[in-house]
Amino acid sequence: MLLSLCSLLLAPTRLLLALWRLVARLGVAVAAVAAGVAYGLWGLWVLLRRGPRRTFRWRVRDQPPPGLADGTFGEHRYLHLKDSGLRLHYVTRGPPTAPLLLLLHGFPQNWFCWRHLLQDLGTRYRVVALDLRGYGASEKPPGRDSYRLEVLLEDIRQVIEILGPPPVVGEGPGGHRGPPRLLQVYLVGHDWGGLLAWEVASSHPEMVEKLVIMDAPHRAVMAGFMACHLSQLLRSSYIFLFQLPWLPELLLSLADFELVRTALTSSWLGIQNAAQRLTEQEVDAYLYGLSQPGGLTPPLNYYRNLFRDTPIPREPPPLPTLLLWGAEDAFLDARLVPCLRRCLRPTARLCLLPGAGHWLPEDQPRPVARLLDHFLGTGDHHH
């Protein structure tokens, strides 16, 4: 009788939640169609401007450009995840006994975006720049389900477990050996890597010593902010485009990946620091993997799983956190920063870099390296 009464009382709440999910899904579907039309018109403009031959021709890069696959920036290695057996590629530099600094890239990049930090911090830390699954030289399992958010988070957890320092046995009262204590790592994420880093640090704070986030929103903040700010909805229009099948792959490939090039190199979307603008070879370091047959689909599947019902951690990471943000970020509204600051612990640090865009590790490599070195080198570890 009591169970029936409880079920009856909860029925309106269940109905409201079901309606809310339906409305949210309809909203995403409408936004995806609208974005598809808008970007489709851009594709038509490219066709009229360049003609069919140049528009529908894209070059598969046969050889990696200098720096991508050689040892210029560090040693190339692979690891196998314990559960899935998936092989992930990473580049490492620094003393093997130094603290582990794990770097997670975003879209549409790969480990190469961390090349400056590998050089600048590789003398004091064991720096590891990972290729996330589906990117670069890491394996690219087929199917959208292989890129669910919970799968990606588990990848990072296992990478920390494999590459991090081994547990040490502590000494308890009276000199007795205590339980193993996990030695932690420094976790740094940009863009998609930052989104993953937020949630790994929240769900596994015992594995992370300090957290650094660069131009990456927390899911708990982003949804509400986007609903209240039309400007962010427009800046994020590509996210809705990526919900569609095949069309994003086609549009991103047009005119030898013109849209990707524009995002990385244009004066208003790309790197703001003129001294750090990407060369043709540096752009090819990203296009090399994306241009391979099927190379665009795995990164886009990250976005296609973004609106699934994956639980969002509501509590901010308990560990020391540094939030770095480019003041001229073209993809993320600057008003997001105070919203993110409010969801962090009072001890968290925030640094807004004037004149910097979204691609912070390449836009301002020297200031970013100094800020990281100072933050990681201070002694404010959590207890």
Give the role of each language-model region.
Residues Q109:
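Glycine-rich NAD(P)-binding loop of the Rossmann-fold in SDR/ketoreductase-type enzymes
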Residues L2-H80, L88, R93-L101, F112, ...:
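Flexible "cap/lid" subdomain of the alpha/beta-hydrolase fold that forms the substrate-access gate
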Residues R115:
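A short, exposed helix-loop element centered on a Lys and neighboring polar residues
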Residues D83:
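ATP/NTP phosphate-donor binding region
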Residues A356-A369:
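Catalytic histidine-centered segment of alpha/beta-hydrolase-like enzymes
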